[in-house]
């Protein structure tokens, strides 16, 4: 006798918890290959996130300002559904999506309180990788 397949999919579905958070922090990680945007509350609990690669951009198109803009819009819309109205933006990295991601968040009607560059800069710590030769 074969068992009937258990309906595990219905058991694993988690109900999305909607939080009412007015203030938050947008962490923008802009590398040369991708841009990742995470929107958190003041305590650091993630409310929403998106990346350029997750929005369907692959290869060199991930590292464009337009891909960062699309990812910011997706993360921003999800954060607005959670009740976000004000954001502090922390940008990390030298990538091309730095400015366009902030503009996309502002275009959604989210008030941007401050923009901070938190790119880690070594005080001559580890030796960098070898020079790239093309």
Curated annotation (Swiss-Prot):
Family: Belongs to the universal ribosomal protein uS11 family.
HAMAP family attached to this UniProt entry: Ribosomal_uS11 (MF_01310)
Originating gene: rpsK
Function: Located on the platform of the 30S subunit, it bridges several disparate RNA helices of the 16S rRNA. Forms part of the Shine-Dalgarno cleft in the 70S ribosome.
Keyword Ribonucleoprotein: yes
GO cellular component: ribonucleoprotein complex; ribosome
GO molecular function: rRNA binding; structural constituent of ribosome
Subunit structure: Part of the 30S ribosomal subunit. Interacts with proteins S7 and S18. Binds to IF-3.
Protein's name in the database: Small ribosomal subunit protein uS11
GO biological process, one term: translation
Listed SUPFAM superfamilies: Translational machinery components (SSF53137)
Domain of life per record: Bacteria
Native source organism of the sequence: Variovorax paradoxus (strain S110)
Pfam families named among the record's database cross-references: Ribosomal_S11
Keyword terms: Ribonucleoprotein, Ribosomal protein, RNA-binding, rRNA-binding
């Amino acid at each position: 006798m074969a068992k009937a397949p258990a309906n595990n999919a219905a058991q694993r579905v988690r109900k999305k918890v909607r939080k009412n958070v007015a203030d938050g922090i947008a962490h923008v990680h802009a590398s040369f290959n991708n841009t990742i945007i995470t929107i958190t509350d003041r305590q650091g609990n993630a409310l929403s996130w998106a990346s350029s690669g997750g929005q369907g951009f692959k290869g060199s198109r991930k590292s464009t300002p337009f891909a960062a803009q699309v990812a910011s819009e997706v993360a921003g819309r999800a954060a607005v559904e959670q009740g976000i109205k004000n954001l502090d933006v922390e940008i990390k990295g030298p990538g091309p999506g730095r400015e366009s991601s902030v503009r996309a968040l502002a275009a959604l009607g989210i008030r941007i309180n401050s923009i901070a560059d938190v790119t880690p800069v070594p005080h001559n710590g580890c030796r960098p990788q070898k020079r790239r030769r093309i």
